[in-house]
Amino acid sequence: MIWYLEDVERAICRARKKIAPVVDGVVNDLNLPKNTDVFVVGGFVRDAVFCELTNTKFEPKDIDLILSKKSDFSQNNNMLWKQENSFGGIKLGLKFFPEVDIFDKYFDCPAIIVGQYFDFNVNSIYYHNKTRQILAAAPFYGFTSNKTIELESFLISSDKIETLYKEPSLVSRALKFQVLFREKYGIDARLSWTILYLLQNMDKQTEQKMFEYTQQKIKDENLRKQVIEQYYNIKTKC
């Protein structure tokens, strides 16, 4: 099916109104600095616009890819989320998938990556510009290839990449933990990655190592206690 550009643009405007609250929620959940420019790329935007074009129901769940940039953009950039005609950085009517040249041209910045095409997007960013920082990542749906991607606790950090190679089976566990933590325990997503790391690694280490790790990762004493408490509560249930 082919749509005229005007139809697509109108669908984008309608979709943005439904996407915006979800984006705001994720931005708040990640505790991004105020006035941080946020980009939404991938299937989340694609699905929202497609539903508007076909007059079908759209139920936002997870955002596929979020990229944040702290500095201002040039006048000719049409990819800012806050601009009326933006489409999350994806070229209108051409492809519904992120392109390496887009990353290279616009996203020379730290990135926060969430979502379905996790491995493709990380590789596009990492191999095209190996100096680029990946601040956080969470594969909600799983890998789209057999590549092994770096994962760790992914607490937001502005000064370094926090990664650790893990086996691909971590992804399926990560999804279960993410749902469990958020829905059953109401635990912040960032803390769930720390707990997941502990569950994956602390069987081979002493409790002292665990406390040292959490002290290093989480400065807030109350949050640190919560992580350790939930670690013990959940360890035998997952």
Role assignments for model-derived ranges:
Residues 1-238:
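Catalytic cores of the polymerase beta-like nucleotidyltransferase superfamily
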